[in-house]
Amino acid sequence: MKAKKKWGQNFIFDKNLLSKIVRASGVGEEDFVLEVGTGHGGLTEELAKKVKKVVSFEIDKELFEMSREKLKIYKNVVIINEDILEVDLLEIAQEHFDGNSFKVVANLPYYITSPIIMKMLDCKLVKEMTVLVQKEVAERICALPGTKDYGMLTVFVNFKAKPEILFNLPPKVFVPPPKVESSLLKLKVYDKPLVEVKDEKLFSEVVRAAFGQRRKVLSNSLKVLGFSKEVLHETLLKVGISPQARGETLSIDQFANLANALYLLIKE
């Protein structure tokens, strides 16, 4: 079956490579696993041999029918024909994993990688993710402050999880080959966020504002939050950040300190 461009489909058929991905994920016989993008069912099948149960989402009706037929011999596999971004993960866990925590292993559709990762990290039952993503995205997630790859995605992911690039894959291992290299990325989710913030929503707003206009200094870019330049100037100095600094130079700790200081101002 031909890959459909609109779904960002790039399949892996090499069983040795699929097996390597499953081994690298570290999943075992007691694990519940959620997969995004069943495709032809190759990765699903390798997972089914190793874990307690796999729930796999496939948005493409034809692939869903085909993979469901192919994998019906596995009693620990459930394939669902729905858009992962539209489902309630807690309900899925309740229905299929007895409400237990689960791991995510997937060859993610590249055009919606970030929304899927963020949705998973927002679910308190996701303990770990091992996902194939564009190499460029993996490098952005693992970037350090002050580098060109460091951005909003870096901060949001690292706030919730510890990222590690396990290995890279060339385009030729996929059918059809994408135009870019890929990486297998592991995200170990923290029991609680890396830093303590008083208000996660405000923390997110501060990060978004700081990166919203990358060339602007913080005392200007943060004005969209409704604070005057003078108040921002004073607050930044109070938490040890130069008002002339730009968002891409701040560590997650600094973002947290800034958000917490602004939170206290709002509460006054």
Curated annotation (Swiss-Prot):
CDD domains: AdoMet_MTases. It catalyses: adenosine(1518)/adenosine(1519) in 16S rRNA + 4 S-adenosyl-L-methionine = N(6)-dimethyladenosine(1518)/N(6)-dimethyladenosine(1519) in 16S rRNA + 4 S-adenosyl-L-homocysteine + 4 H(+). S-adenosyl-L-methionine binds at residues 10, 12, 37, 58, 83, 107. Specifically dimethylates two adjacent adenosines (A1518 and A1519) in the loop of a conserved hairpin near the 3'-end of 16S rRNA in the 30S particle. May play a critical role in biogenesis of 30S subunits. It comes from Caldanaerobacter subterraneus subsp. tengcongensis (strain DSM 15242 / JCM 11007 / NBRC 100824 / MB4) (Thermoanaerobacter tengcongensis). Pfam families: RrnaAD. It is an enzyme of class 2 (transferase). The gene is rsmA. It is found in: Cytoplasm. This is Ribosomal RNA small subunit methyltransferase A. InterPro entries: KsgA/Erm, rRNA_Ade_diMease-like_C, rRNA_Ade_Mease_Trfase_CS, rRNA_Ade_methylase_Trfase_N, rRNA_adenine_dimethylase, SAM-dependent_MTases_sf. SUPFAM superfamilies: S-adenosyl-L-methionine-dependent methyltransferases. GO terms for cellular component: cytosol. GO terms for molecular function: 16S rRNA (adenine(1518)-N(6)/adenine(1519)-N(6))-dimethyltransferase activity; RNA binding. SMART domains: rADc. Belongs to the class I-like SAM-binding methyltransferase superfamily. rRNA adenine N(6)-methyltransferase family. RsmA subfamily.
